[in-house]
């Protein structure tokens, strides 16, 4: 039985985050030939259980996010050195990989995430550190995983390495029968950051009169607070605090008429993959990542004018919207199920 250590997440049971959900489902769909050990943040879990989904849990008393993520990942890597395989999710701890390769015979597999160093939210120093960490991850890993074909292309063009493309599952969100008689609101769900085109979406809806339910961490940043102040008085826009309850999310997603996805960076986004399982039309920001995820079959916008044209022409576009919804579901079922994703990971071990 192969021993696989997973490094780089807050841990399981998943409280939030794409990587945590990935780990929860890798362990849930694990075959009998795999024994996982997952490193967890002692700061995240008040109750520290020893096992979950058949995986052993090891706690490190540091935060998994922010500046502490670097020593958190490094300590996790050092404790993983006797494993058969180390699966690293994200690159922040990869500064330690040259040492790990010297002291361990483990196979190193790294999911480099969504080109974090390119994100506008980071300052110059953090961007440089993340870029260097990415370089180390690619250079010192036996296998590199990319969650989107565009990132696979980036790795090939910049490092000459063939990354393996494995996305995320989304079928865990289906908690019942999806409501086909949709309500009259559009739904959007994301971290409230400029790169997710939050203001573009809000501004367009403020002028259109269409109903929008927008879920996000509005009070976690000055940008989010600014958005609340600017748009909270529009009666057609409902700005909802983060929802982590999967049943509540199911109801919101199930009843929406369409989903608006503003992400412009980060590879394959879990929230997009998840909504595709609901057979809802997707209005996505026009970038290579989103086009790959939706196989060029969503409706795309690059600015307010594009989005408003879709919103203002629902009747004319009804057949296109219906076909889009059917395509989203078909793509989700063929590409984005956790059983398939878990099998793809295990094939690399």
Task: Please report, for each region that a protein language model flagged, where it lies by residue.
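Aromatic "clamp/platform" in nucleotide-sugar-dependent glycosyltransferases that forms part
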Residues: 263-264
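Short hydrophobic beta-strand element within catalytic cores of glycosyltransferases
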Residues: 258, 280-284
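Conserved donor-binding/catalytic core segment of Leloir-type glycosyltransferases
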Residues: 5-7, 179-215
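Membrane-proximal helix-turn-helix segments that form the acceptor-binding/catalytic region
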Residues: 78-81, 126-144
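Nucleotide-activated donor-binding/catalytic signature segment of Leloir-type glycosyltransferases, i.e.
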Residues: 216, 225-246
